[in-house]
């Protein structure tokens, strides 16, 4: 992952939208995030139809009725993506039976390389609960837009490339609407505690 000013855009958009109509809970400070979204509406997320790591079609409607913890990244990511997925997995492990109310979802920002088979092998390291999603580049671009995700290909030596991208975990409610969001700096125990409050 590359850190650029553009990668901060989703945070700024979310903060602006929050300031425009959401309620902040000053008393609920979460390390790695600060204030967390506790009520109100924000236009994040939307309908999509992608393919999971087993090659099966998956639509956003498949997850209705359950909470989702959604993260956008890519399997060739050298640092923040595996670290964040590990935090998600550890947080869910700390939630006991409540973890069954949340589906952890990893959506690739690199559909050219992240085939279903690649996603399946990659996500196996984080446990069986994860749903990995990929699709055609235009499908992924649309989902990125819906979730206000920044992702841009960055050329590297030897013809390879990395991805500069925002790093946000989105907690989506059973109705598919945003409940809260977290950055990669949050610790598993803090994430687990806040998730338990919100679900």
Label every model-predicted segment:
Residues 195-199:
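Short, hydrophobic alpha-helical segments
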Residues 43-45, 67, 164-166:
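Short, small/polar residue-rich loop motifs at catalytic or cofactor-binding pockets
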Residues 1-47:
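N-terminal targeting signals for export/organelle localization
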Residues 69-70, 104, 169:
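Hydrophobic beta-strand anchors of alpha/beta hydrolase catalytic cores
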Residues 83-143:
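Structural microenvironment flanking redox-active thiols in thiol-disulfide oxidoreductases
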Residues 139-194:
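Thiol/disulfide oxidoreductase modules built on the thioredoxin-like
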Residues 61-84, 88:
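Short active-site neighborhood of thiol/selenol oxidoreductases, capturing the structured segment around
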Residues 48-68, 92-95:
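A short beta-strand-turn-helix
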């Amino acid at each position: 992952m590359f850190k650029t000013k553009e990668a901060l855009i989703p945070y700024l958009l979310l903060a602006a939208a929050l300031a425009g109509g959401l309620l902040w809970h000053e008393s609920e400070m979460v390390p790695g995030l600060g204030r967390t979204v506790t009520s109100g509406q924000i236009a994040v997320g939307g309908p999509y139809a992608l393919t999971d790591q087993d090659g099966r079609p998956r639509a956003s409607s498949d997850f209705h009725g359950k909470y989702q913890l959604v993260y956008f990244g890519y399997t060739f990511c050298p640092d923040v993506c595996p670290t964040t997925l590990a935090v998600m997995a550890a947080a869910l492990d700390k939630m006991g039976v409540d973890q069954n109310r949340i589906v952890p979802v990893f959506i690739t920002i690199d559909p050219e390389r992240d085939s279903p088979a690649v996603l399946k092998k990659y996500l196996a390291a984080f446990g069986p609960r994860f749903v990995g999603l990929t699709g055609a580049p235009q499908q992924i671009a649309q989902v990125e837009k819906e979730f206000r995700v920044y992702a841009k290909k960055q050329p590297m030596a030897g013809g390879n490339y990395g991805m500069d991208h925002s790093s946000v975990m989105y907690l989506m409610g059973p109705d598919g609407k945003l409940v809260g969001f977290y950055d990669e700096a949050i610790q598993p125990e803090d994430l687990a505690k806040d998730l338990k409050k919100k679900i």
